[in-house]
Amino acid sequence: MELAMVNLSEGNGSDPEPPAPESRPLFGIGVENFITLVVFGLIFAMGVLGNSLVITVLARSKPGKPRSTTNLFILNLSIADLAYLLFCIPFQATVYALPTWVLGAFICKFIHYFFTVSMLVSIFTLAAMSVDRYVAIVHSRRSSSLRVSRNALLGVGFIWALSIAMASPVAYHQRLFHRDSNQTFCWEQWPNKLHKKAYVVCTFVFGYLLPLLLICFCYAKVLNHLHKKLKNMSKKSEASKKKTAQTVLVVVVVFGISWLPHHVVHLWAEFGAFPLTPASFFFRITAHCLAYSNSSVNPIIYAFLSENFRKAYKQVFKCHVCDESPRSETKENKSRMDTPPSTNCTHV
């Protein structure tokens, strides 16, 4: 589901949209829309760069050495975020830049559908990562048999299949509508309003609330276990496990904050009288931008909280400079620079 599908100023509801707060035009569009487009542009640029860098770092593991389950889940999260940024934000930006929908029926269905798929893949992947951390720390003796690449890949496949299935009603009910004023809008239309209410509730419960509760449960167990076992762990092992848990926990908290306003808007619009005021307009736009920004903040979190990722980032740039260095370098330097980064560099 997409914020623009509710009866909001983007015009994707079942009734004529109310006018947004009056503002002076700037470059042919309203000031609010112009600012929103600038924010979209920043989110897009930061997200594409950051997620591409994360994918590059994780892809440069030593040949023949299996990737950690944590890294596979992070890789899946980055791929979903990057695909969303590339396939959704540029098209959705036209809603703010143009007075009518010009991209056709397929794009209308696809961007709203993939928006929901990406949201679900993200939360389900974060839930899987929390379970992975729980098994690694609380059940460390059994984790070696459970936390293998094969199981992680099966989990990733299941996450995508479940997300694609859960988002299918969005693609089915998203339609183009034409007005007498020669304007076209990409709207969501459900023949039965009760079905739409049920879908909104199910998406909130199964695509937000329950995964967050599972995540909270796993991290409560992890923190309790670390507190009890603190004295029996080596300082290096203790610091490594705490840092990994901290990184994933921050990613989860940011996700929860980023998507909560989105769900509040949808539930409010379906079950209450959503006010059409300048304040509510600002809240909707803020919810919209927060939801989009979640796809670009995870690489920043890795960079600030994970020392191993920072080292891996530097290694990527170092190898890039190395590849473009003159061939007249000594054999010793060339051999050292051409060595691929160790897999340990990418273990968050």
From Swiss-Prot:
<keyword id="KW-0325">Glycoprotein</keyword>
<dbReference type="GO" id="GO:0007189">
    <property type="term" value="P:adenylate cyclase-activating G protein-coupled receptor signaling pathway"/>
</dbReference>
<feature type="transmembrane region" description="Helical; Name=5">
    <location>
        <begin position="198"/>
        <end position="218"/>
    </location>
</feature>
<keyword id="KW-0449">Lipoprotein</keyword>
<feature type="glycosylation site" description="N-linked (GlcNAc...) asparagine">
    <location>
        <position position="7"/>
    </location>
</feature>
<keyword id="KW-0812">Transmembrane</keyword>
<feature type="compositionally biased region" description="Basic and acidic residues">
    <location>
        <begin position="328"/>
        <end position="337"/>
    </location>
</feature>
<comment type="similarity">
    <text>Belongs to the G-protein coupled receptor 1 family.</text>
</comment>
<feature type="transmembrane region" description="Helical; Name=1">
    <location>
        <begin position="35"/>
        <end position="55"/>
    </location>
</feature>
<feature type="topological domain" description="Cytoplasmic">
    <location>
        <begin position="292"/>
        <end position="348"/>
    </location>
</feature>
<feature type="topological domain" description="Extracellular">
    <location>
        <begin position="173"/>
        <end position="197"/>
    </location>
</feature>
<comment type="subunit">
    <text>Interacts with GRP39 AND HTR1A.</text>
</comment>
<keyword id="KW-0675">Receptor</keyword>
<feature type="transmembrane region" description="Helical; Name=7">
    <location>
        <begin position="271"/>
        <end position="291"/>
    </location>
</feature>
<feature type="transmembrane region" description="Helical; Name=2">
    <location>
        <begin position="71"/>
        <end position="91"/>
    </location>
</feature>
<keyword id="KW-1003">Cell membrane</keyword>
<feature type="topological domain" description="Cytoplasmic">
    <location>
        <begin position="219"/>
        <end position="247"/>
    </location>
</feature>
<feature type="topological domain" description="Cytoplasmic">
    <location>
        <begin position="56"/>
        <end position="70"/>
    </location>
</feature>
<feature type="transmembrane region" description="Helical; Name=4">
    <location>
        <begin position="152"/>
        <end position="172"/>
    </location>
</feature>
<protein>
    <recommendedName>
        <fullName>Galanin receptor type 1</fullName>
    </recommendedName>
</protein>
<keyword id="KW-1133">Transmembrane helix</keyword>
<dbReference type="GO" id="GO:0017046">
    <property type="term" value="F:peptide hormone binding"/>
</dbReference>
<dbReference type="GO" id="GO:0045944">
    <property type="term" value="P:positive regulation of transcription by RNA polymerase II"/>
</dbReference>
<feature type="region of interest" description="Disordered">
    <location>
        <begin position="328"/>
        <end position="348"/>
    </location>
</feature>
<feature type="topological domain" description="Extracellular">
    <location>
        <begin position="269"/>
        <end position="270"/>
    </location>
</feature>
<dbReference type="InterPro" id="IPR000405">
    <property type="entry name" value="Galanin_rcpt"/>
</dbReference>
<comment type="function">
    <text>Receptor for the hormone galanin. The activity of this receptor is mediated by G proteins that inhibit adenylate cyclase activity.</text>
</comment>
<keyword id="KW-0297">G-protein coupled receptor</keyword>
<keyword id="KW-0807">Transducer</keyword>
<dbReference type="GO" id="GO:0042923">
    <property type="term" value="F:neuropeptide binding"/>
</dbReference>
<feature type="topological domain" description="Extracellular">
    <location>
        <begin position="1"/>
        <end position="34"/>
    </location>
</feature>
<feature type="transmembrane region" description="Helical; Name=6">
    <location>
        <begin position="248"/>
        <end position="268"/>
    </location>
</feature>
<dbReference type="GO" id="GO:0005886">
    <property type="term" value="C:plasma membrane"/>
</dbReference>
<feature type="glycosylation site" description="N-linked (GlcNAc...) asparagine">
    <location>
        <position position="182"/>
    </location>
</feature>
<keyword id="KW-0472">Membrane</keyword>
<dbReference type="GO" id="GO:0051464">
    <property type="term" value="P:positive regulation of cortisol secretion"/>
</dbReference>
<keyword id="KW-0564">Palmitate</keyword>
<dbReference type="Pfam" id="PF00001">
    <property type="entry name" value="7tm_1"/>
</dbReference>
<dbReference type="InterPro" id="IPR000276">
    <property type="entry name" value="GPCR_Rhodpsn"/>
</dbReference>
<dbReference type="GO" id="GO:0004966">
    <property type="term" value="F:galanin receptor activity"/>
</dbReference>
<feature type="transmembrane region" description="Helical; Name=3">
    <location>
        <begin position="110"/>
        <end position="131"/>
    </location>
</feature>
<dbReference type="GO" id="GO:0007204">
    <property type="term" value="P:positive regulation of cytosolic calcium ion concentration"/>
</dbReference>
